[in-house]
Amino acid sequence: MQTKVVKIDPFQIDENEMKEAAELIRKGELVAFPTETVYGLGADALHPEASKKIYAAKGRPSDNPLIVHICKFEELVSIAKEVPTQAEKLADAFWPGPLTMIVWKNEKVPYETTGGMETVAIRMPKHPVALKLIEESGCLIAAPSANTSGKPSPTEASHVKLDLDGKIPMILDGGPVGIGIESTIIDLTEDTPMILRPGYITKEMLEEVLGEEVKIDPGIIASDSLTKPKAPGMKYKHYAPKADLVLVDGEAENVVKKINELVAEKQKNGLKVGVIATDETKDQYQADIVVSIGARADEDAIAQHLYKILREFDDWNVDAIYSESFATPRIGQAIMNRLLKAAGHQVLQV
């Protein structure tokens, strides 16, 4: 299969190119497209065979649910068994945007899309290309990240092509994404709403809108993979570069000292070592490759650069990677959640 890459201006969308992509979706084929979070790999969410193609192209376990992308709230109503009042409040506040809600599904949604679950994850993306594709196709679009399962999520079309070239018919190239990490996922099927995946929309933001407590699933920081995942990203190793990644957490001075010791040890054995640092510390490391993820206080930049940097280390063929910890106040939990999964929960406290 030849993969067609179509450059598309998000602010001046070519109708003919979008019609071609929409027709592929209607035929049960796959199209990769930009969202404000990461690039998604889309197919008709209500077409069981189309959803199966997503799992096959990504090498994704079939019990890992897909997020259904919509362009209007009525589409949530059309596939939900019931619509919690919380869903309406959250949609008013955060949609379109990087928030996914889990509700009970009705019979329209195939189990191939929900990973065998009785619940369905739903989001209205903010990116104009994503919204136009949903509208033009007339389909609800199931879309996980457009990458090989387990690898860092794609924040540019080139990342999608690297992973899925020859496996899907089309990639819509809308340029680099804005946020860089996946949406927050909130489960609305329990008595108390619960965050199953942290993201740009924080617990505090959700609680302010809902006027009630929002819990955080312990699995966000745990490494247990025995339970059935209710949301994408909960069970399997994700976001991982080829090289072994270890996080080093502690006071900045101690972290720099420890990482340099670890780097020296690896280099003695002839290994090529990379370090993920910040603007404040990048000049203090003696690794083969040192990359700054941004200023420590700039959470948005850290989130936006994370996956791109992990992929760049693959290009540089490093043997080991050490990273500072980025437990910042606002979206730091989301950033650390992704890093912990990428590192297979390998953390050194110093």
Name these PLM-found stretches:
Residues 1-350:
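Active-site-adjacent structural elements in enzyme catalytic cores
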